[in-house]
């Protein structure tokens, strides 16, 4: 058993009739009205325009870093790319940037200033584009936004931070409450969801804009036989931003509920802090990523799920819809095999991995967007591919697992 922090479990909505069960003194409701919990009201995503297909990436990378002579490493990256199940990725980094900042293509030369100079506008503009998409879908006055949550693990450490800059770019009010989260990593999509849930359920009139924006420019560097983690990172990660708007008690005349956040919790797998993470150095953000990460996650995933679904009496994992961080093929395959999931359960996650790679903290927002669009396209009755309850999973440094119980809404 590993330590955990939980948000509130299900609470009774006074205007609804339902059946309930009692679990350790907490009233658990399975048939609550939509809106009594924090509800996702809009989703937006954004991608930079520069696309590189995975089949071309090895040649691009070794040419860009002047490393064609490292033939063994090139063969290694080719094998990693072929086995990644990624078709293409989007990047903010351009050939012009590499020409103007050639040290970015070296392995460990000091480049922190150059990276920060380039990352600040890139991450911010991606965040703005995703937020604009969410605000457009929500279609309510921006003056109704009361809180802003911004996460990035890829630079932008100025003061005031990108949360301040985004507030001004979007024309939001000067009294909006801001929360800036740095370097949580790939699990942070679940973190912003959990934080937004706590804010919404303690401020019933709140409307929270939560944004995750990332760029791999922070970790782009030349190859080295002494650091294979760098090579894996080059094959796996992509750029993108995701945004969601969250609030309680939606006005159904003008707002459309997409998903309800029933519970949210975070767990750390003991003894795994060495497995994945990074350090900010003069050479930029230096990634470390060990091959044991998928095993750590799959060995602990059942315990995470049992803990949060036991109050609902749910033990059939195939009865759920799945919004899983697209952290890599081995993680996705491991979860599917460990839980004996039907092949279609993780199709939304696999689709996002194929199309965009691992987009770090924004990954689960992209999967959520794919899930609701897929549900509508297939004529499903709910935004969860016809299922009522689902799970959102984020994984990252720690090793940390974010586990959220999600309830779908009617698919329109």
What are the language-model segments listed below?
Residues 128, 154-156, 160-161, 168, ...:
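Claisen-condensing/thiolase-fold acyl-transfer catalytic domains that form or cleave C-C bonds
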Residues 41-44, 151, 182, 207-214, ...:
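Short beta-strand segments
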Residues 210-213, 217-220, 269-275, 329, ...:
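Acyl-CoA/ACP chain-elongation machinery
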Residues 22-120, 216, 222-299, 303-307, ...:
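Condensing-enzyme catalytic core mediating Claisen C-C bond formation in acyl metabolism
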Residues 35-38, 142-146, 174-177, 203-208, ...:
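Short coil/turn connectors at secondary-structure junctions
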Residues 113-119, 150, 178-182, 229-231, ...:
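A short glycine/serine-rich beta->alpha loop
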Residues 84-172, 183, 316-332:
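Conserved beta-ketoacyl condensing-enzyme motif
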């Amino acid at each position: 058993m590993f330590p955990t922090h939980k948000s509130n479990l299900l609470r009774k909505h006074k205007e609804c009739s339902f059946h309930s069960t009692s679990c350790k003194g907490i009233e658990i409701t399975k048939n609550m009205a939509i809106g009594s919990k924090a509800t996702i009201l809009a989703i937006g995503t954004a991608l930079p325009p520069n696309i590189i297909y995975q089949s071309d990436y090895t040649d691009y990378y070794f040419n860009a870093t002047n490393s064609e002579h490292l033939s063994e490493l090139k063969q290694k990256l080719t094998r990693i790319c072929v086995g990644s199940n990624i078709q293409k990725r989007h990047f903010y980094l351009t050939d012009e940037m590499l020409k103007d900042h050639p040290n970015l293509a070296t392995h460990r030369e000091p480049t922190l200033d150059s990276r920060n100079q380039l990352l600040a506008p890139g991450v911010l503009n991606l965040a703005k584009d995703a937020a604009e998409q969410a605000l457009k879908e929500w279609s309510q006055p921006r003056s109704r936004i009361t809180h802003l949550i911004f996460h990035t693990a890829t630079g932008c450490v100025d003061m005031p931070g990108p949360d301040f800059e985004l507030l001004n770019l979007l024309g939001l009010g000067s009294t909006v409450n801001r929360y800036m989260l740095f370097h949580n990593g790939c699990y942070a999509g679940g973190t912003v969801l959990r934080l937004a849930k706590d804010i919404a359920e303690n401020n019933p009139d709140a409307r929270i804009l939560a944004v995750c924006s990332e760029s791999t420019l922070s970790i782009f560097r030349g190859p080295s036989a002494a650091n294979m983690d760098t090579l894996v990172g080059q094959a796996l990660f992509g750029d993108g931003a995701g945004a969601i708007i969250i609030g309680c008690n939606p006005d159904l005349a003008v707002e459309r509920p997409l998903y309800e956040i029933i519970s949210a919790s975070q767990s750390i797998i003991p003894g795994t802090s060495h497995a994945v993470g990074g350090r900010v150095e003069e050479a930029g953000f230096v990634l470390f990523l060990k091959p044991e990460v998928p095993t750590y996650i799959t060995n602990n995933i059942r315990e995470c799920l049992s803990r949060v679904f036991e109050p609902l009496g749910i033990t059939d994992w195939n009865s759920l819809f799945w919004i899983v961080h697209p952290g890599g093929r081995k993680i996705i395959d491991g979860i599917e095999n460990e839980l004996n999931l039907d092949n279609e359960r993780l199709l939304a996650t696999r689709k996002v991995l194929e199309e965009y790679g691992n987009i770090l903290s924004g990954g689960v927002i992209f999967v959520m967007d794919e899930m609701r669009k897929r549900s509508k396209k297939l004529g499903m009755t709910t935004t969860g591919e016809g299922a009522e309850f689902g799970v959102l999973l984020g994984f990252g440094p720690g090793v940390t697992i974010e586990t959220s119980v999600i309830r779908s809404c009617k698919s329109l």
